[in-house]
């Protein structure tokens, strides 16, 4: 069985207050002067002080083999801030740090270790505030208002490094080869790791490590680095430095899931909901010129316009990609929402998913068998549900303590206002009718025959995404739904958490003393007119799930207050994020894919045309990470997700899976 929790570091603090690993019998940093050793070995060994001012790109990427206490990262971050202060006009604007850690420290141990370096406190406090829960995979932390990105990969580096997406190939400007000493932790120091370091290193990229072990030097040379010895720090006689002086060939094992970015930095986004808003911010942070075209007279009038939406992960014991995406997507969403400098109604009150019948009880039992971190999800017995939710249900379930609700409409509007302050241009009442290539650009034709030309286009227009010739064959479908707005009652006012059953019910929003209950589900429908049947069904589902709960019967839908919207979904419940695939070319190029995988060309796509769609009913959870993934892809930067999970988000995935099995593919 796959486990979804990472074992924390087993450590103690010695007489000097230095953390020591019990498993590896080694210190995390020098008892003498760990901070100065880091500056000498890793910053000095990679010549970063001299390289930063001359770096020809806006982003500098550093990768590290063992995060530990984060000393190397914090020291580098401090040095980067000092560089930016001294060279505000330099080409280099942002720092991206990628690190791997098999046994992450707890937040408490991290804070205790950081007390060693009071001069690093301003940076350490930001790291501690965003420290992720122990879930496997990549955790992206956006620090210093996005100027510093930290990708923490939790798990065994020799397993993780083989799962990385090709977006990391030849991207690393400097390697920090760190970790417990080779004699203490030989399993990490492998030729597999050295080869991967060479594959990820940019031509001209460097490495530094504290060790001078002969097998390490020879292994790095075999991988392709030119190595040399340097005087070690303090009492250590020697250390190693290296440079990647060649350009290594980069074979691709799954070209059908290749992701291509763009060399351009000007884009039009088609949409007006949470996907468009968060993508705009992510691209602006990377220096893009962004224009948004919204078909409506205001933002968030589509599926993102609800008063309250629940935030919690979608989990399934039988779908590893779905678990990885939604669990890490959920934690990223919480970090992003907490860091946004905008106001929106929300309450991280927790979400409890109840086993109201035999099928739902079985589903919850399967989720709980996955060894999830308690910070993510925990079992709750029937007699404890009332204590944490405030209402009686007579059901057991699973609770997500960091979940809650937020107002999607307010979030979307205010994020777009923030993006406008950063340079976003918005045009309302622009209904896109057609897009076509013209002189290496996209010609957009809107209702009323208005036209505009843009270098790059992203389609983030919800259920309307398949209205164009380039997207008409996509396997997505519409789902119409109605959310009821109900006034609170003395009984309903006791509800302290979001309840999920065969529907959902939110606690009251103090701003309007109303709850949201929903939602009806009509696959294939785009109906947005109020339905009295849907209104009554929303109420009846609650009563049917909790027939003995008197509070449920106080729900009043008679005022006919509701909101109707249309979602875009896929049959595998995952979003579609990436290049818009060329359906006709895919069928031609991959006609014999099942027999000729080794001859496959890169996935056929439309140049500089991207999509961000099919968020279904979990857009609040998935949109933040999807926006970050797509912005990174478009900008040709490291993507915060492993290759197999990224493949599960690829818009061509449903076609390719069939073609790989030699099965026929149909449009839609």
UniProtKB/Swiss-Prot annotation:
Pfam families: DAO, Methyltransf_30. Keywords: Cytoplasm, FAD, Flavoprotein, Methyltransferase, Multifunctional enzyme, Oxidoreductase, S-adenosyl-L-methionine, Transferase, tRNA processing. It catalyses: 5-aminomethyl-2-thiouridine(34) in tRNA + S-adenosyl-L-methionine = 5-methylaminomethyl-2-thiouridine(34) in tRNA + S-adenosyl-L-homocysteine + H(+). It comes from the Bacteria. InterPro entries: FAD-dep_OxRdtase, FAD/NAD-bd_sf, MnmC-like_methylTransf, SAM-dependent_MTases_sf, tRNA_MAMT_biosynth_bifunc_MnmC, tRNA_MNMC2, tRNA_S-uridine_synth_MnmC_C. Catalyzes the last two steps in the biosynthesis of 5-methylaminomethyl-2-thiouridine (mnm(5)s(2)U) at the wobble position (U34) in tRNA. Catalyzes the FAD-dependent demodification of cmnm(5)s(2)U34 to nm(5)s(2)U34, followed by the transfer of a methyl group from S-adenosyl-L-methionine to nm(5)s(2)U34, to form mnm(5)s(2)U34. This is tRNA 5-methylaminomethyl-2-thiouridine biosynthesis bifunctional protein MnmC. It comes from Escherichia coli O157:H7. The lineage of its organism: Bacteria, Pseudomonadati, Pseudomonadota, Gammaproteobacteria, Enterobacterales.
